[in-house]
């Protein structure tokens, strides 16, 4: 889903070997390079959650990069959901909770 300006919001949950391999740092760097805002965090079950907002085409590029991941990561599955942007993020950050 995208608004009239082409902006969208992406929610992704990434499964596989994605913790302990600098995956969150990788997502932070990739999202910053693409000019996206949002957050990334580890989930207690070993998956990683990504919330990102920005240009729909840039978000689609992020999805491709999330599938690849950093060296040492092995993505086995990714669930994605598109919504209209909410504008709740000013930058991209790693949440440590």
Regions found by a protein language model. Give the residues of each.
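Intrinsically disordered, low-complexity, mixed-charge
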Residues: 1-97
